[in-house]
């Protein structure tokens, strides 16, 4: 799986790292793994670092992923920041944010990791 993650409870953060080609199955696997992780507690915020990844995913699959992310919100996940450098990854992430916001997910995408980190820290 080209997506790994770590939970830093003391920082209130889940950080996921995506590399290579990422597909819907990878994202679904990430969500399932986080949901099953005993370190996942309410109040965490998430950073999805996709700077070194390229997506291979359809809009319909993005909508399905957004729907599954709602399970994380129901368990107490806060806002989600996405860091994306390539134009393709950025466009796909922007599409995801539109779909996710439509169902109540607080998410945004950034080209710079520092901007994503700063946004996550606001109001924390």
Each model region followed by its residue ranges:
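Amphipathic, Lys/Arg-enriched alpha-helical "gate/interface" segment within cytosolic domains
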Residues: 1-124
